[in-house]
Amino acid sequence: MRQMISMRRLGSKSRLLGAALVAALLPAACANPFDTSVENPNAVVEEALGDPAGATTLVNGLGASVTRALTGIAGVYAVSSDEMTWTGSREYWKTLDDGDIADPVNEYADGGFPYVAEARWLSDYTIARLTEFNTAGTLRNKKDLARANIYGAIIYMTIGEMFDDFVLASDRTVAAAPIGGANMGVTFDSAVAMTTRALTLVQTGGVAADAELERQALGLRARARYGKALRAIAKAATVPAANLVSDAGATADATAALTKMTSTYAFKLTPTANNLAGINIGYETNNRGEIRAGSTFVNPNPTVIYLVADGIAGIKMNDPVTGVASTTVSKAIDACCRRTVGNNIPMIQTSAREMMLILAEARLAAGDTAGFLTQVNASRAVDALPAYTTQITSAATAKATLEYERKVQLYLQGRRLMDMYRFGSADARWLASGVGVRGRCLIPITYTERLTNPDAPQPNNERKCS
């Protein structure tokens, strides 16, 4: 018993000594051990971003943000079309494959949305900062401002091409209302303004001649002008019979761009391990196996269905002239959807062949079949494919040819779903009741934005397009 009492006393003394030691040390360490107001010496405070010396770094960060946003949202758009299909176990990929793109709770749409919103905000912020530097005469390299405008144009037109509605005026913790689906054309107007500023800087604004920036700006401006006209057709209450795009500005820009581009030119954003979205199209396709290139394009591996069969045997879609597996599709699949590609899928933003297809469509809209064939055949020549000759026998076959060539030449570039809507095409995987069919819907403002932004659509789980 005495031993037990002694041990208790010793324990009590030890605890008292420990408490005294902690009390003695606290003033030397901090007044409150739970105080979180400790400065991180590695943090960049916003005031530092007011230094013109950081302009290049700021623009590089914007480029990384835009690229990350694309990796996070491209799969949602592609699986909702016939470009990709669900092959895994996650139900929300299946609902997209079924044509239900309008669900704001979909985990993949909701997971990608914040990256797109971040890139939109950062583009506005970066362009404004560098414009201030340029006005003050302190911007060291005007190409940085041109690049910022190009990245901004990419994210703005991506929003216009992929989303039903969006919040454009929010500023960090300051909420704002969405602009409304009927007003989404302003995203393309913003992209046109940004690419125009980039062109002005490159051509007359004191930037040393930069042919690559000029190509990018011209090609992206053509895409933006074309995209605005396409959205107006695809999202009309009733898709008009005259469902071809003929925009004078897009045609002029495409023509000018082709004078600067080689026939094989493509401007790509290629992600790295440091700028991938948490759930990204590369990982879901080439690692996890949740999604795969669509069944109209490819044949699956006979033993592993979430992989494309090896080589040309993996290509299901035939070329209408050669009658054999499309080498255009084969090249596209090799660039995006093979295990060897991994997570870092290059994403084409503009290309010479897209410029040719814009010009081809404008000629077809004008009833100029010969001019249409000239441009389409030029785009096919990029892959050394033979020209169309006697295959075009009517306006209907010409239009079907246009849809086919856009389908294979612009694969996985965020163009397909609106083409499907305007041409009346449907994915075999779409359910008859799916809102992708019924409402020609695009990606909605998703759950997280609705939950955190009181001005966003409510209730936060309600479909606004059906």
What does each model-identified segment do?
Residues 30-80, 319, 388, 428-466:
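Membrane-proximal, proline-rich intrinsically disordered regions
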Residues 1-28:
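Sec-dependent bacterial lipoprotein signal peptides
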Residues 237-356, 385-386, 401, 409, ...:
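Hydrophobic-face positions in mid-chain alpha helices that act as interaction patches
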Residues 56, 93-162, 197-207, 343-352, ...:
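Conserved, well-structured interaction surfaces
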Residues 59, 120-123, 188, 195, ...:
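Inward-facing hydrophobic residues that define packing positions of alpha-helical scaffold repeats
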